[in-house]
Amino acid sequence: MRLLVLSSLLCILLLCFSIFSTEGKRRPAKAWSGRRTRLCCHRVPSPNSTNLKGHHVRLCKPCKLEPEPRLWVVPGALPQV
C-alpha cells in the first residue's frame, strides 16, 4: 500500500516537474534548409590568432539580417483582454 502511494506521488511529481520546466521557454529558430546563410567573417587582430602555417584566422558566424521582434508567449496561457 505504501509503495503504491509513494510511486504514484513520485510519478505526479515527475510529471509536474517536466511540465513546468518546459513551460515558457522559447523554441529555437528553425534553420532554413533550402537557403544558404551568408557568413560574416572578421579577422582577429591579435598575434596569437595564427594557425600552425602562420595564416591569420577568421572568426566566421552566420550574419543576422534583420532582428525580428518576437513575442514571448507562454504555452497554454489565456490571452489578456
From Swiss-Prot:
Highly cationic protein that has multiple functions. Acts as a chemotactic factor that mediates lymphocytes recruitment to epithelia through binding and activation of the G-protein coupled receptor GPR15. May be a tumor suppressor; together with SUSD2 has a growth inhibitory effect on colon cancer cells which includes G1 cell cycle arrest. May regulate keratinocyte proliferation. In addition, through activation of Mas-related G protein-coupled receptors (MRGPRs) contributes to pruritogenesis by activating itch-selective sensory neurons and mast cells degranulation. Has antimicrobial activity against Gram-positive bacteria, including Staphylococcus aureus and Actinomyces spec., and Mycoplasma hominis and lentivirus. GO terms for biological process: defense response to fungus; defense response to Gram-positive bacterium; G protein-coupled receptor signaling pathway; lymphocyte chemotaxis; mast cell degranulation; negative regulation of cell cycle G1/S phase transition; negative regulation of cell division; regulation of keratinocyte proliferation. It comes from the Eukaryota. Induction: Up-regulated in the skin of psoriasis and atopic dermatitis patients. Keywords: Antibiotic, Antimicrobial, Chemotaxis, Cytokine, Disulfide bond, Glycoprotein, Secreted, Signal, Tumor suppressor. Its main location: secreted. Pfam families: GPR15L (PF15854). Expressed at high levels in colon, and cervix and at moderate level in tonsil. Highly reduced expression in primary colon cancer tissues compared with that in adjacent tissues. Highest levels of expression detected in stomach and colon; expressed in epithelium of skin and esophagus, and in some tumor and/or tumor adjacent tissues (TAT), including TAT of esophagus cancer, hepatocellular carcinoma (HCC), squamous cell carcinoma (SCC), basal cell carcinoma (BCC) and invasive ductal carcinoma (IDC) tissues (at protein level). Highly expressed by inflammatory differentiated keratinocytese. It is found in: Secreted. Residues 1-24 form the signal peptide. Interacts with SUSD2; the interaction is direct. This is Protein GPR15LG. GO terms for cellular component: extracellular region; extracellular space. Disulfide bonds join 40-63, 41-60. GO terms for molecular function: chemokine activity; G protein-coupled receptor binding; receptor ligand activity. InterPro entries: GPR15L (IPR031713). It comes from Homo sapiens (Human). Glycans are attached at residue 48.
